[in-house]
A protein has these predicted regions:
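Short coil/turn linkers that define WD40 beta-propeller blade boundaries
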Residues: 86-87, 140-141, 180-183, 230, ...
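A short beta-strand motif characteristic of beta-propeller blades
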Residues: 45-51, 87-92, 141-146, 184-189, ...
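Conserved strand-to-loop turn within each blade of WD40 beta-propeller repeats
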Residues: 72-75, 126-129, 166-169, 216-219, ...
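Hydrophobic beta-strand positions that form the internal "hydrophobic ladder"
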Residues: 69, 123, 163, 213, ...
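Intrinsically disordered, low-complexity acidic/Ser/Thr/Pro-rich linker and tail segments
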Residues: 2-79, 84-85, 97-99, 109-112, ...
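WD40-repeat beta-propellers
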Residues: 78-81, 132-136, 172-177, 222-226, ...
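Loop/turn segments within WD40 beta-propeller blades
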Residues: 61-66, 104-120, 156-161, 200-210, ...
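WD40/WD-repeat beta-propeller blade N-cap
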Residues: 50-57, 93-101, 107, 146-153, ...
C-alpha cells in the first residue's frame, strides 16, 4: 500500500512526559535471559466464515479548515474522519428510513479555535425519503429536520446558511438552517416538468448582491436562476435528441463556465454567460456522477468520474480559453459515487468499493511523468471497517472448554455464532433483532462472559436478552430507557455497565433485580467518546474523548480521574490486568503506558518522549491500530486492518522494524485480473439480476470451516510488523496459548459487489 505524508505528532504538554532522554536500563542478566529465551508460539484459530461487508460510500464532504471529512454510506450510516491522521472519530448508524444521498459539514462562525471540535461543526444529510436532517453528534439521532413537500431530495448544496435542494417534483427550493430550530422554507421557484437531479450555486469571483444558481434535470435540460427574483434566466437543452438523458452533477467555475455530467458519460462544458456549449468530453462509457473543481480562479481545472470509475482531469488553457484533457487514472475498480478535493495535493474518491481512495496529485494532474515511468499515480486506500469493535466473545460455555460464543453486531441486528476450538469450525446459531418497529439502527452490543446474556442499544433504548444454548432460544427480558454507546458485563454477569455520551453518565444495572443500581456522572461538558475499555477484575472503565481527554472511572468508589496523555487524539485504550496498567495508543500510533495506582506514566513511557524513539518505519506506518491483545504483563500485540505488531516492554526498541510479508498460500493468493474480468462479465450480462447476485453471495459465505494458518510466533524481534492475515476484525486470547483471529476475506467481498453498469433506474 502506498503512502501519503502525515503531520508530525504533537508533543505532550504533560510534565510527566518531560523526563530524562536516557533509556531505562536492562541489566545483563535480563539481556542474557532474553537471548536464551526460546521462541514460543500461540496456537491460532482463524475465523473467516462470518461475513462483514461494508456499505458503499454515497457522498464525501471535506472541511479542510478543520482537517476533517464526513461521508455517508448506502446503509444510512454516517462517519467523520480526521484527514491528517485518518482516525474515524465519529460513526453512528443512522436511521433505516433515512437513506442518505448527500452529507454536508458546516463550520460554525465566531467559535474560538480552542473550542472542542463538537462545538465547531454542524452535520446535515438529505436523502430519497425527502428529509433534510441536522444530526446531533452526541445522541447520534436527528436533531432538526425539514420535510420536502416535493418528495425525494436528489442533491443539496449550501451557501452560508441557505441550502438549495433538488426536488423530485421539479421545483427548486431554498431552505434556511438556523442554530436551534428546524430548517424552514424561504423560497420556492417555478416548477418544471422534469425531476431535478442536481443543483449548484454559481461560483463567482466578483462580489455581487445577485446570487445565481443552476438546476440539472432528468430530461437533460439545465436552468440558470436568479435567486433574489426567482426568474429563470436561461434554459439549455441537451444537445442530444435523447430525452432520457439525466444531468447527475454540475460544477460552476469563475462565473463563466458550467460543467455538467450526464448519464451518457459525457462532460459538457458551457459558457453560461452566452448559453453556448464550448466543449464536450466523452471519456466514460457510463454515467458521470461527480465533478469537483480545484477552486483556483487563475488556473481553473476540474475532476470528474462516475459509474465508469476512470477519474479524468480537465483544465482551462487561459491563453486560448480552451478546455483540454490533461490526465486520467483508474484508482478504484468499481463505481465512484463521490469526489472531494482535500487540498491541492490530494483528491479523495469513494463508491462501491467502500473504502476511501486518496489519489496523489502532481501539479493538479492524476499522474507524474518520470524519465522511465509514465502514468504513475501514488494512491492509498483507507479501510472502510469501523474502528469500534463489532465482535464480542464469551468464555467457554461448556465444561469441556471446546466451545465459545461470538456475537457479531451488524447494522440492524446481531448474529450469534458458536466456535469449536478443536475442529476450528464456526456455526451460525441465531439472529438477535431489536424492536423491528423502531427506525433506528444498532449503536452498540455485547455478550456476557458466561454467554447467557446479550444486550444491544438503539435509539434511546438498551434491550436485555437471555440466551439458552441447549434450546438455542433467545428471549427479551427488559428494555432500559437509556442509550448506550458502550456496553459491558461484569465477570460474574451480575451487573451491566452502560456508558452513554448523550447523558454523559454510566448506568450500572443489577441483572437479577432488573433495575439501575447507580448513575455515575461523567465530565460536566458532554463529549464524543472515541474509544473505551473495561477492566473485568476491578469493574473500572477508561475512555478517551473528542476533546483529547482521557478518564478513568472507579465504579466502586464512584470516582473519576484524569489520565495522563499526550495532546492529541487517543484512538485505542486497553487495560493490562496482568500488571495493572493502562495502554494508550494515540492517533500517530505512538504508545503510552500508565500505571493505574499512581496515575503516572511508567518508566518505559517517560523514556520515550519523541517519535524518534520508536522504529523509523513504524513511525511512518499509516495503518491505524484497531485493537490491542494482551499476551503477558510485558508483551502485547497491536493489530491493524492488515497486520499485527509484537511489543515487548523488556526489550530495546529497534531503529527499524522488521517486516514479515504474507507468504500467500493457495487460499489467500488472488488473481485480481481474473476476479475483475469475471466481475465485468457479470455486469454486462443482462440476465445478471438480483436473484443471481443473491445466489453468488450465499455461495461465498455458506462455508463454516475456517482457514488454517501457521501459529503466531513470538520471537525475539521486537516491533516486528507481520502481515499474515486478511482484514483483521478481532484478535483475542481465548486461553493462555490460543489466539483467535476473526478476519474478512476481501476477495469474497469484491466478488459480491453489485455490477456498476446495471445502475438501478433513478427514483427506485
Amino acid at each position: 500500500m502506498n503512502k501519503t505524508p502525515s503531520k508530525k505528532s504533537n508533543k505532550s504538554n504533560n510534565s510527566s512526559r518531560k523526563s530524562s532522554k536516557s533509556k531505562s536500563p536492562i541489566n545483563k542478566e535480563q539481556q542474557s535471559s532474553t537471548k536464551q529465551k526460546a521462541t514460543f508460539e500461540l496456537s491460532t484459530l482463524r475465523i473467516n466464515s462470518i461475513e462483514n461487508t461494508p456499505s458503499p460510500i454515497e457522498h464525501i464532504c471535506c472541511l479542510p479548515s478543520l482537517s476533517i471529512l464526513a461521508l455517508c454510506r448506502s446503509d444510512s450510516s454516517i462517519e467523520i474522519w480526521t484527514t491528517n491522521t485518518w482516525i474515524q472519530v465519529i460513526k453512528f448508524p443512522g436511521l433505516k428510513s433515512l437513506q442518505t444521498r448527500r452529507v454536508f459539514l458546516y463550520h460554525k462562525k465566531n467559535v474560538p479555535d480552542s473550542a472542542p471540535l463538537i462545538n465547531k461543526i454542524r452535520l446535515f444529510t438529505c436523502g430519497i425519503n425527502g428529509y433534510l436532517v441536522e444530526w446531533s453528534l452526541l445522541s447520534n439521532l436527528p436533531k432538526f429536520s425539514y420535510k420536502n413537500p416535493g418528495g425525494c431530495i436528489w442533491d443539496m448544496q449550501f451557501k452560508d446558511k441557505i441550502c438549495l435542494i433538488a426536488s423530485n417534483d421539479g421545483t427548486p427550493r431554498a431552505v434556511k438552517v438556523k442554530k436551534s430550530s428546524n430548517p424552514y422554507l424561504i423560497k420556492q421557484f417555478a416548477k418544471s416538468d422534469s425531476r431535478i437531479l442536481s443543483v449548484c450555486w454559481e461560483n463567482s469571483t466578483i462580489k455581487t448582491k445577485t446570487r445565481l444558481f443552476y438546476t440539472g434535470h432528468s430530461n437533460g435540460t439545465i436552468c440558470k436562476w436568479n435567486f433574489e427574483t426567482g426568474q429563470t434566466l436561461l434554459t439549455l437543452s441537451n444537445p442530444s435528441a435523447d430525452n432520457d438523458i439525466l444531468i447527475w452533477t454540475m460544477c460552476s467555475i469563475n462565473s463563466k463556465y458550467l460543467l455538467c455530467g450526464d448519464s451518457t458519460g459525457k462532460l459538457l462544458v458551457y459558457d453560461i454567460n452566452f448559453g453556448v456549449l464550448v466543449k464536450e468530453f466523452k471519456e466514460h462509457t457510463a454515467d458521470i456522477l461527480s465533478i469537483v473543481s480545484n477552486g483556483n480562479p487563475n488556473e481553473p481545472s476540474a475532476y470528474f468520474t462516475g459509474i465508469d470509475s476512470l477519474i479524468c482531469n480537465v483544465k482551462l488553457n487561459t491563453k486560448n480559453n480552451e478546455w483540454i484533457l490533461t490526465s486520467s487514472f483508474r484508482g478504484q475498480s468499481h463505481d465512484i459515487n463521490s469526489l472531494s478535493l482535500l487540498n491541492e495535493n490530494y483528491l479523495l474518491s469513494g463508491g462501491i468499493t467502500t473504502d476511501i481512495c486518496i489519489n496523489h496529485l502532481y501539479n493538479g494532474n492524476m499522474y507524474q511523468k518520470y524519465e522511465k515511468k509514465i502514468n504513475t499515480n501514488v494512491k492509498r486506500h483507507i479501510s472502510p471497517f469501523e474502528h469500534k469493535q463489532n465482535y464480542y466473545l464469551s468464555d467457554f460455555i461448556d465444561s469441556s472448554k471446546k466451545n465459545i460464543l461470538i456475537l457479531h453486531k451488524k447494522h440492524d441486528y446481531c448474529d450469534l455464532w458458536i466456535l469449536n476450538i478443536n475442529s476450528n469450525t464456526s456455526t451460525y446459531l441465531a439472529k438477535i433483532y431489536k424492536n423491528k418497529k423502531n427506525d433506528s439502527n444498532i449503536l452498540s452490543a455485547n455478550i456476557s462472559r458466561d454467554g447467557k446474556l446479550i444486550m444491544l442499544s438503539y435509539d434511546d433504548i438498551t434491550s436485555l436478552f437471555s440466551y439458552d444454548y441447549d434450546k438455542n432460544e433467545i428471549k427479551k427480558i427488559k428494555e432500559f430507557k437509556h442509550q448506550s454507546n458502550y456496553i459491558f458485563f461484569s465477570s460474574d454477569s451480575s451487573k451491566a455497565y452502560l456508558l452513554s455520551q448523550k447523558t454523559s453518565k454510566v448506568y450500572i444495572i443489577d441483572i437479577n433485580a432488573l433495575k439501575v443500581l447507580k448513575e455515575i456522572s461523567l465530565n460536566k461538558d458532554k463529549d464524543i467518546i472515541l474509544t473505551c475499555d473495561f477492566n473485568y477484575e476491578s469493574n473500572a472503565i477508561a475512555y478517551s474523548t473528542l476533546s483529547k481527554q482521557v478518564y478513568y472511572i472507579d465504579t466502586v468508589k464512584e470516582e473519576i480521574n484524569s489520565v495522563p496523555h499526550p495532546d492529541c487524539f487517543i484512538s485505542k485504550i486497553k487495560f493490562n490486568t496482568k500488571n495493572n496498567t493502562l495502554i494508550l495508543i494515540d492517533e500517530y500510533n505512538l504508545i503510552y503506558i500508565v500505571d493505574i495506582p499512581t496515575m503516572k506514566f511508567t518508566q518505559w513511557t517517560t523514556d520515550r518522549i519523541e517519535k524518534t524513539d520508536f522504529p523509523i518505519n513504524y513511525v511512518k506506518w499509516y495503518n491505524k491500530i484497531y485493537g490491542i491483545t494482551i499476551i503477558s504483563k510485558d508483551v502485547f500485540l497491536l493489530y491493524t486492518d492488515y497486520n499485527y505488531i509484537k511489543v515487548d516492554l523488556t526489550k530495546q526498541l529497534p531503529k527499524e522494524s522488521l517486516i514479515e510479508k504474507n507468504k500467500m498460500d493457495k487460499y489467500v493468493k488472488s488473481d485480481w485480473e481474473k476476479i475483475i474480468k469475471e466481475f465485468h462479465q457479470k455486469i454486462f450480462d443482462e440476465e445478471y439480476k438480483g436473484k443471481e447476485y443473491s445466489k453468488i453471495r450465499n455461495d461465498m459465505f455458506s462455508s463454516t470451516s475456517n482457514k488454517k494458518v501457521p501459529d503466531i510466533s513470538l520471537d525475539n524481534d521486537n516491533f516486528k510488523i507481520v502481515s499474515k492475515f486478511n482484514s483483521i476484525m478481532l484478535m483475542d486470547m481465548i486461553n493462555e496459548n490460543t489466539m483467535l483471529v476473526v478476519e474478512n476475506d476481501w476477495n469474497k467481498i469484491v466478488k459480491t459487489f453489485p455490477g456498476g453498469v446495471i445502475k438501478p433506474n433513478y427514483g427506485h
